[in-house]
């Protein structure tokens, strides 16, 4: 497999990941959440989705996998730490930070099925 083939594979994976994030964001909106950020990047890491419902802010990691267990297992302890660190930076910039509660969720996006939301996953 040449470099060109790897580039095509990476591009497809990025496109699939981006599409999964859009699907997850739409799913959250149907559940009454307001999307505050998609693919929010900080110097400490990236958060796929930042959403809010009332005083609850959720930081969501989206995983496109064939099964729920594979999606949950794909969020490593190191990734959880990066997401928490990035969320601390995001929260520090919010004027109403003191009254916000926060939660860390996972959304599994699987082919041919509705997304599965795992609240308080880590």
Swiss-Prot record:
It comes from the Bacteria. One of its GO terms (molecular function) is nucleic acid binding. Gene3D superfamilies: 3.40.1350.10. InterPro entries: Restrct_endonuc-II-like (IPR011335), tRNA_endonuc-like_dom_sf (IPR011856), UPF0102_YraN-like (IPR003509). Pfam families: UPF0102. NCBIfam families: PRK12497.1-5 (NF009151). Belongs to the UPF0102 family. This is UPF0102 protein RHE_CH00320. It comes from Rhizobium etli (strain ATCC 51251 / DSM 11541 / JCM 21823 / NBRC 15573 / CFN 42).
